[in-house]
Curated annotation (Swiss-Prot):
Required for normal Golgi function. Necessary for embryo development and pigmentation, especially for the expansion of cells and organs, and for the formation of the organized shoot apical meristem (SAM). Probably involved in the generation of the extra-cellular matrix. GO terms for cellular component: Golgi membrane; Golgi transport complex. This is Conserved oligomeric Golgi complex subunit 7. The keyword Transport applies. It is found in: Golgi apparatus membrane.
Length: 836
């Protein structure tokens, strides 16, 4: 058994643990005593071996110390000697550097002189070559060898750049420019012929010549000039066909008039929208052919030549295109078609009054824009290999004819919506007369309620038109227009409410100040109103309650529309933020590499093909303004239609005020003269028998009010059922609605009654008993409606029911603490009770 000494070197060595583990590792047949003896003997032997080894190694180390000391001393002496040698070498190097610095400087000057001499020699060679080229260039031109002439002119240009601004060669520089123009003029006819007849080899050779003399721009211009001719002819075919059709129609009309028959012309004017589709199809086919031909003829330039051709085309056709678009919008409406005018003429105010911009005008423009959008998508696919900047410029040129219309989109939309809102009829067309007010009110309320979804549909259509026509780039103008139109519509509703107040009999009756009516006339007028109320009061009440549904519908529909508008703005924010590259907008597209193509464009590059981004990418101020607005739409507190939201709330308040005035009008009418009733001051008649001669029943004025209040829940029930559709929550809302209005009217009636009671100057004992009965009846009605009795009304009832001689004692008793003191004192004053 070998003894492992490893555990003894561990700093955390535990002797007890080591002994226990050794005992556990013994053979089962060995006794513990024997194992411990063997272990002790092995430890002792190992200890002796370690001690002997240490003694031997220590002796050897002592013998090596003197030798090592001598070696260290020798190395120290060598180091001192080496340091001295190095110091001497450094001193010699410093001396050598000082003596050779002048030599090196002289050599540097000589080298500079050599370089200048070589440059001068080369310049002289270039000058000599330039002189020789100048003398032989005419011969080269005379030979008609255009490639050689191009090489000669290129060599002259290189020589001139080497010579620099030397006065002696100023004439040569001018001569070179003249020669380059001359060579370009010689190339152009051949280039025109090569482009016209699609001569690939000739076109390539001429391209090399133009590039050699730095006139590649001439190739672009000549290419566009040649290729534009068939496109312009294609564009002018529309006017030619229109004139031909017009002449044919006039000829047919003259023949019909001369012959007297009913012959009708079969020829008709071709609409610009249908013609534009065919024009775009033919133009796209033409560009596809050019793209393929240029890929062969100009493999390095086709990705710029063909897009620039389209840009030049749209530039040449721009004014005519805008004019045709304008006339095409006018053709959508007979009035403007007859005058040969369009939407731009309407906006400028050149047409007679009564002819306004209609939805059809803008829809026709959007249809043409959609046709152009389809063409633009095909162009994007065709030019996908071109650089992003070139592609965006090309698509911007395609949409350029619509730019003037887009800039006036807000004005167009506002005019369209304003005219559409103006034709909304909110008044019920009913002849005034007895029994007609209720019908007129009901019809007007019905029309008001039906107009709300109609107006919302108009606003939603405007949002769709904005997205379809401008891609959302005019969203800020759209919001302003929608807000203004909503204000216009709500103003119409407010004016209608004012007229309904007259219909309902709660306004427009005059204040009576300065009235010249005599007493009999006033009595007849009051009688007529009473008759009218008895016949129509409940129909007017029902009609007035229906106005609440108008306010509720307007509030809910406007809220839903505004939420939908915010969602639309949020979607625009997401798409435009990506399209316009965020903060890189100020730099436009400069962060994209010039060699980057659509094949490896980033997401932002691909999204930039959006019609709105194409329009905004070069107008960062407008883009940032729009993005700021769209970013604000994310805030839950944001109101897309801020002014309209305020006016909707104000309209709801006005409706509530009108409904309350209608519901309280009968109460106001019945209680209007209560404080001046003669019964309050009447006295008891003297009779031979002590019998009461006052009425123990409530008077008609208070029973009429009570019956009205008790009947009111039945009138509110149909409207509450209309609010409650499905679900317990809606039922609870309906119950709350009915209860709320019931309490409003009851509280108002109670307040009016108490005001009349306060106006009584004197009341007799008989009058007090009668008024106590009236108040008790009204209190019972309020209790039946689950309304608390106001303390003031309860005080009136208590003080009036108490006999005159006992009132002082009641007020001084504990029961008097429950009374309203000012009211109790007022009753005492009415009953002429003094506390002195």
């Amino acid at each position: 058994m070998m003894l492992d000494l490893g555990p003894f070197s561990d700093e955390k060595f535990d002797a007890k643990r080591w002994v226990n583990s050794s005992c556990q590792a013994r053979h089962p047949q060995d006794s513990l005593e024997k194992h411990l003896v063997d272990l002790e003997m092995k430890l002792q032997i190992a200890s002796e071996e370690i001690g002997a080894s240490l003694e031997e190694q220590s002796g050897g180390a002592l013998l090596r110390v003197p030798r090592a000391t001598r070696d260290v001393l020798r190395l120290r002496d060598d180091a001192v000697s080496l340091r001295g040698s190095v110091a001497g070498i450094l001193q010699k190097l410093k001396k050598a550097e000082g003596s050779s610095a002048d030599c090196i400087a002289a050599l540097a000057r000589v080298d500079n002189v050599k370089q200048r001499m070589e440059a001068a020699y080369k310049t002289l060679q270039d000058a000599a070559g330039l002189t020789q080229l100048s003398s032989t260039v005419e011969d080269v031109f005379a030979s008609g060898d255009l490639p050689r002439a191009a090489e000669t002119l290129a060599s002259m240009r290189n020589c001139l750049s080497a010579v620099g601004e030397v006065a002696e060669f100023a004439n040569v520089r001018k001569q070179l420019e003249v020669l380059e123009d001359r060579l370009e003029a010689m190339v152009q006819p051949r280039l025109t012929d090569a482009l016209t007849y699609h001569k690939v080899d000739v076109a390539q050779d001429l391209r090399v010549i133009l590039i050699r003399i730095g006139r590649f721009k001439s190739l672009e211009l000549q290419y566009s000039k040649v290729r534009l001719k068939p496109i312009k002819q294609l564009w002018e075919d529309f006017d030619t066909k229109q004139r031909a059709n017009k002449l044919a129609n006039e000829r047919s009309e003259s023949q019909r008039l001369s012959s007297g028959d009913e012959f009708q012309s079969t020829s008709s004017q071709t609409s610009f929208a249908s013609w534009l589709t065919s024009f775009y199809d033919e133009l796209l086919l033409y560009l596809e052919q050019e793209w393929k031909w240029c890929m062969v003829a100009f493999p390095d330039d086709y990705m710029t030549l063909v897009p620039k051709l389209l840009v030049e085309t749209m530039g040449v056709l721009g004014a005519s295109f805008v004019s045709r678009l304008n006339l095409a919008t006018g053709d959508a409406v007979p009035e403007t078609k007859a005058l040969a005018k369009g939407v731009m003429d309407l906006l400028s105010g050149d047409l007679p009054k009564g002819i306004n911009i209609q939805t059809k005008h803008l829809e026709a423009l959007i249809e043409l824009h959609n046709v152009t959008g389809s063409f633009a998508r095909n162009i994007q696919h065709l030019f996908a290999e071109s650089e992003l900047r070139i592609l965006i410029d090309t698509l911007k040129a395609v949409y350029s004819p619509f730019e003037s219309f887009k800039q006036k989109y807000g004005k167009m939309e506002r005019a369209i919506l304003s005219s559409e809102i103006a034709v909304v009829d909110l008044r019920g067309a009913v002849t005034r007369g007895v029994g007609a007010q209720g019908i007129e009110l009901s019809e007007t309320v019905r029309r008001m309620e039906e107009s709300i979804p109609q107006v919302v549909v108009l606003l939603e259509a405007a949002v769709e038109r904005c997205i379809g026509f401008t891609g959302g780039s005019e969203a800020d103008e759209l919001i302003l227009a929608l807000d203004d139109i909503m204000l216009q519509y709500i103003s119409m509703l407010q004016e209608t409410l004012k007229s309904l107040r007259v219909v309902c009999g709660v306004d427009g009756t005059g204040d009576g100040v300065g009235s010249k009516k005599d007493a009999s006339a006033e009595k007849r007028e009051s009688s007529r109103k009473m008759d009218l109320t008895s016949n129509e009061e409940w129909s007017i009440v029902q009609g007035a309650l229906q106005i609440l549904t108008v306010a509720d519908c307007l509030t809910s529909r406007s809220s839903v529309f505004e939420a939908s508008l915010r969602a639309t703005l949020a979607r625009l924010n997401s798409s435009l933020s990506i399209s316009l590259f965020g903060t890189n907008l100020d730099h436009n597209l400069s962060h994209l590499k010039s060699e980057q193509t659509a094949g490896d464009l980033s997401m932002a590059g691909r999204a930039s093909m959006d019609v709105a981004a194409i329009r905004l990418v070069d107008v960062p101020e407008k883009a940032h303004k729009l993005l700021n607005l769209l970013e604000q739409s994310k805030d839950p507190r944001f109101h897309a239609l801020p002014l309209a939201s305020q006016r909707v709330a104000a309209f709801a308040d006005t409706v509530n005020e009108l409904v309350y005035d209608v519901l309280i009008s009968k109460v106001r009418q019945r209680l209007g003269e209560v404080s001046r009733l003669p019964i309050w001051s009447s006295v008891e008649e003297q009779t031979a028998f002590p019998l009461p001669n006052f009425s123990s029943y409530p008077q008609s004025y208070v029973t009429s009010v009570g019956e009205y209040l008790l009947t009111l829940p039945q009138q509110l029930e149909p409207l509450a059922e209309g609010i409650s559709t499905n679900g317990d929550s809606n039922n609870e809302d309906a119950q709350f609605f009915a209860t709320e209005w019931m309490f409003k009217v009851a509280e108002g009636a109670t307040a009016l009654y108490m005001d009349q009671l306060r106006g009584i100057q004197y009341i007799s004992d008989r009058g007090a008993q009668q008024l106590s009965v009236d108040i008790e009846y009204l209190s019972n009605v309020l209790s039946a409606l689950s309304m608390p009795i106001p303390p003031v009304l309860a005080t009136f009832q208590t003080c009036l029911a108490t006999p005159r001689g006992e009132l002082k004692d009641v007020m001084k008793s504990e029961a008097g603490n429950e009374l309203d003191c000012p009211t109790a004192n007022l009753v005492c004053k009415m009953r002429r009770i003094s506390f002195d």
